[in-house]
C-alpha cells in the first residue's frame, strides 16, 4: 500500500499516520481479547498514535505519565491532547513529587514552573551551576567533577547531554583525560553502572547518585 524509500526504511514519525490511513481505508482488526490496556510514559506518544491505539484497542485504558518529562516536543502529548483522543476519559492529577529532593525540585521550578507541583520536604545538597567560557574549559571542569565523584563514595554518575551526537562527542573527549567512562547510546546492548555519558532520551527511567548536565545554556536548550 505504501511505497518506501530506496533503503526500504520508514521514518518512525510516519508509522502512526500511515497506520491511521490504512485503518481508515481498509478497516481495522480490533484486538477484542484485550480487556484493559495500561500505557506508561503517556507524554512520549503523539496524538495520532493515541488515535491508532483507540482504533485497535477500544477497551478501557489507564494512561500514566508526566508531561514535564517529555524529551521530544515534536512527538509528545499533554493531558489535554490525550483527552481529545479519549473523550470519555477521567483525568486524575498527582501533584506531590517524591522522587527529587526539595532543592532539585526548586531548581527545576525555576526552569519550567508548575504551580500545581507540591515538593516533599526531603532535603539534600543544593545543585551547583558552573559557568564556563568555552567547550575546552567545560571539558576540564567535567573532568574535575568526575575526579571529585570518584572520591565521594557514590557509585553512579550520569553525564546527560541533550542529544546522542553530543553524548558521543563528549564521551570521546572525556576518555582522553580519564578512564572508565562508558557511553550509553541507542546501539548499546547493556547498561553499565559507574560513570555513564548518555542523552536525555536514553537516560529516561535511569537513576544516578549524581548527575552532570553539560551545555546547559539557552543556545543548546532553546
Regions found by a protein language model. Name each.
Residues 1-16:
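Coupling/switch/interface segments within P-loop NTPase motor domains and analogous charged loops
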Residues 12-27:
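Short, hydrophobic/amphipathic alpha-helical patches that form generic packing surfaces
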Residues 23, 27-36, 43-222:
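Conserved helicase motor core of SF1/SF2 NTP-dependent helicases
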Amino acid at each position: 500500500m505504501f511505497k518506501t524509500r530506496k533503503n526500504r526504511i520508514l521514518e518512525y514519525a510516519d508509522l502512526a499516520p500511515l497506520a491511521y490511513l490504512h485503518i481508515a481505508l481498509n478497516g481495522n482488526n480490533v484486538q477484542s481479547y484485550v480487556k484493559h490496556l495500561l500505557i506508561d510514559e503517556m507524554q512520549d506518544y503523539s496524538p495520532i498514535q493515541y488515535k491508532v491505539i483507540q482504533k485497535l484497542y477500544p477497551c478501557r485504558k489507564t494512561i500514566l505519565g508526566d508531561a514535564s518529562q517529555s524529551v521530544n516536543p515534536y512527538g509528545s502529548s499533554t493531558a489535554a491532547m490525550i483527552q481529545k483522543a479519549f473523550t470519555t476519559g477521567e483525568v486524575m492529577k498527582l501533584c506531590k513529587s517524591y522522587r527529587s529532593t526539595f532543592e532539585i525540585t526548586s531548581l527545576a521550578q525555576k526552569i519550567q514552573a508548575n504551580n500545581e507541583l507540591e515538593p516533599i520536604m526531603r532535603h539534600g545538597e543544593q545543585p551547583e551551576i558552573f559557568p564556563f567560557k568555552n567547550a575546552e574549559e567545560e571539558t576540564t571542569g567535567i573532568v574535575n567533577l568526575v575526579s571529585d565523584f570518584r572520591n565521594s563514595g557514590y557509585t553512579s554518575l550520569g553525564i546527560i547531554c541533550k542529544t546522542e551526537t553530543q553524548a558521543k562527542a563528549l564521551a570521546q573527549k572525556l576518555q582522553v583525560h580519564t578512564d572508565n567512562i562508558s557511553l550509553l547510546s541507542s546501539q548499546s546492548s547493556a547498561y553499565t553502572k559507574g560513570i555513564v555519558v548518555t542523552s536525555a532520551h536514553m537516560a529516561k527511567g535511569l537513576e544516578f547518585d549524581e548527575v552532570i548536565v553539560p551545555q546547559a545554556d539557552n543556545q543548546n536548550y532553546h
